[in-house]
């Protein structure tokens, strides 16, 4: 009976002395955007969509693009700062063209994590 109590105490002590497990976050922070910039776009659609072709054609931008195209975008420079928000689609875009009128190579991101 006494040996069971000692074994229990030893197990409890060894568990208490064990270092905590290290957790590594492999996700890219939401306020960072790989090789592009965080934008708030009124509209985001596939580059092959008719709506995107209608925007890209008159601006002399190649229409054989792939991926997502954001239109009427504005930069979100200070993500996480009070008052910074996007009521439309938040995206990470690699190429900002025509002063944000059209952004190419966009990927949707979630700032509400």
UniProtKB/Swiss-Prot annotation:
Keywords: Cell wall, Disulfide bond, Secreted, Signal. It holds the Pfam family Hydrophobin. The keyword Ion transport does not apply. InterPro entries: Hydrophobin. It is found in: Secreted; Secreted, Cell wall. One of its GO terms (molecular function) is structural constituent of cell wall. Disruption phenotype: Leads to retarded growth and displays denser aerial mycelia. Slows down primordia formation, leading to fewer primordia and subsequently fewer fruiting bodies. The keyword Signal applies. One of its GO terms (cellular component) is extracellular region. Self-assembles to form functional amyloid fibrils called rodlets. Self-assembly into fibrillar rodlets occurs spontaneously at hydrophobic:hydrophilic interfaces and the rodlets further associate laterally to form amphipathic monolayers. Aerial growth, conidiation, and dispersal of filamentous fungi in the environment rely upon a capability of their secreting small amphipathic proteins called hydrophobins (HPBs) with low sequence identity. Class I can self-assemble into an outermost layer of rodlet bundles on aerial cell surfaces, conferring cellular hydrophobicity that supports fungal growth, development and dispersal; whereas Class II form highly ordered films at water-air interfaces through intermolecular interactions but contribute nothing to the rodlet structure. Belongs to the fungal hydrophobin family. This is Fruiting body-specific class I hydrophobin fbh1. It comes from Pleurotus ostreatus. The gene is fbh1.
């Amino acid at each position: 009976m006494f040996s069971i109590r000692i074994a229990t105490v030893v197990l409890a002590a060894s568990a208490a002395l064990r270092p905590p497990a290290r957790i590594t976050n492999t996700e890219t922070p939401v306020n960072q955007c790989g090789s592009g910039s965080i934008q708030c776009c009124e509209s985001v659609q596939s580059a092959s969509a008719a709506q995107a072709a209608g925007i890209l054609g008159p601006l002399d931008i190649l229409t054989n693009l792939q991926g997502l195209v954001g239109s009427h975008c504005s930069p979100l420079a200070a993500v996480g700062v009070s008052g910074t928000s996007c009521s439309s689609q938040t995206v990470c875009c690699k190429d900002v063209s025509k002063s944000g009128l059209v952004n190419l190579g966009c990927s949707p991101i979630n700032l509400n994590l």
